[in-house]
Amino acid sequence: MTSREQLVLQVLQELQEAVESEGLEGLVGAALEAKQVLSSFALPTCREGGPGPQVLEVDSVALSLYPEDAPRNMLPLVCKGEGSLLFEAASMLLWGDSGLSLELRARTVVEMLLHRHYYLQGMIDSKVMLQAVRYSLCSEESPEMTSLPSATLEAIFDADVKATCFPSSFSNVWHLYALASVLQRNIYSIYPMRNLKIRPYFNRVIRPRRCDHMPATLHIMWAGQPLTNHLFRHQYFAPVVGLEEVEAESATTSLAPTPPALAPLPPPAKTLELLSQDPGLSYSYLCERYSVTKSTFYRWRRQSQEHRQKVATRFSAKHFLQDSFHRGGVVPLQQFLQRFPEISRSTYYAWKHELLGSGTCQALGPMEELEKLTEEQVAEGLGCSSPAVSSPGMVLMQRAKLYLEHCISLNTLVPYRCFKRRFPGISRSTYYNWRRKALRRNPSFKPAPVLSVAGATQPASVGEKALLPWEGEVGEEAGKATGGGQPAPREFLPLRMPLSRWQRRLRREARKQVLSGHLPFCRFRLRYPSLSPSTFWVWKSLARGWPRSLSKLHIQAPTLGKGGIQEVEEKQEKEAGRNVTAAMAPPAGTLQMTASPGEDPGAALGGPSREGALQEGAMAQGRPMVAAAGGRDGQVLVMDMLATTKFKAQAKLFLQKRFQSKSFPSYKEFSALFPLTARSTYYMWKRALYDGLTLVDG
């Protein structure tokens, strides 16, 4: 036994002893020591001594499973050993025998331990790999495997790493990714034409984590026991070599074999072209020979040459951006578009944010420093020399995030429409992510009540109240008021911005239709979703005195002017708002805001009707409804409020029951049952359920 083999065995023994300790701390410490030992000698470029050339034997079981879309003129070979034979197959492909399988196993364990975050979350293909890990536990796609949480996958990863320290253990998909990084080569993972639903996650080219040169490609096949014409059970890996290499090996048995001449990675366009080489094939022909489902056949048929070329270009562009990021910086947009003009700007920025958020490179330093800056430092950062910090986009995003956190710290929730008016470049999803994080950091936050006296003028006042000034802006406005300050730049316009012309026109049109009495409440909510329900009832309460108030406005118009008319209208709406608030305040205990525990869930599944909710609300009162506003309008107001409350409670109960039964509905299904509930409300309730909150008690 050579000194190299003794060192490898010693490293494996130390790793096996560290496995017995709880957690991964001891194993990570042993991996750091093993890395120092293994870095003292590199992997050989060819076989050094050892036994003579072995007789190559074709694996008949793997050959019967060899797929049609795999590279031609290649044969799977028999590999001797125990377990899944992944490291033995790689050693045989590179050095002609399995002598270095233990060293490859040790190096792979070190790679997986020291770069655990990368393989679970950091790389571009991490979602595909994790999905493949879910399906590797079964022979076909199932809902149980699809819904495995990330914590379970991390536990499986840790268990697989510990098991890899021992010979004869079985390997998984992330072992292929780690082995590709250890060997600095691409691995062509060949998967049989079985288990068609999960095959795309396994039949793919796996690239190393980092590589400074154009890597060669190893071909390794998933082999095992065929169950039916459609299914097979994976048992081991088989090395795949070209026919020329087999002939050269048998022709030069007296000479020491050299490493096989590995073929370069085929371009993505050629790889995708193998799926549908003959577009004239019929479904019946493919169904008889390859057991292809009808949906898969028509999906392949729709993939034209142009579509495959676009997919190949996108594939190459994504990996080009990843390689440039690992070399120390992201390629600028103009340079990227010159190389890949087919890729859109939004796609480029999406990939860029994905790479910056992975946390696997030192390029995140400027972003982390920017997160720690205060508002004044962000303003001073505009003159910074670093392009990552001084770019306008980064400064704008940091300003928007700090502004939202500042408003929430002042117990004020900024609506998205007001936030977007101030920061038009921030998407809705980014806004809600920032708002959720800010709310978690402020547990004492208490939102304002929905029904208030000033609710009548909500569309005109929400935007003005929500846009609170910054600390620096307060000083600027004070200086401007005293006459000693400089005029504010365009970013710091006065915060009390008037509504745009189309919003005013929309509001006037809605008011006119409500006052005319031809617009019911349900149609008002569908036609004007941006206006609050309290606004409708304020206008509805003014409908009785509309001619008298209109004549009064016409009489006062010559003396008051336009501003006076608006003040009179606001005064009337405020007075009506007080009446509406009094009408919507029934005795204590009469309104039930949550669904009862014994409520039949079938009613929620079928979509609750408005009439049923009204009848239940009236029965709960036990007496005729009498509104403070008087007359039919006040009664309709209270009945509609009861219906809205019951409707929202049933929607919450429906989502909570479906969440508990692990069959959460999509927004399309939910909106079919509850059409008046906004999309943002659905996602807010969904996020609350997944965060562990309860929507309805009982």
From Swiss-Prot:
The alphabetized UniProt keywords are: Developmental protein, DNA-binding, Nucleus, Transcription, Transcription regulation
Per the UniProt entry, what is one GO biological process? regulation of transcription by RNA polymerase II
One GO MF term on file is:
sequence-specific DNA binding
Q: For this UniProt entry, what's an example GO CC term?
A: chromatin
Q: What is its main location?
A: nucleus
Protein location? Nucleus
As for family, the record states: Belongs to the vertnin family.
Explain the purpose of this protein: Acts as a transcription factor that regulates development of thoracic vertebrae.
- Record protein name field: Vertnin
Q: Which gene encodes it?
A: VRTN
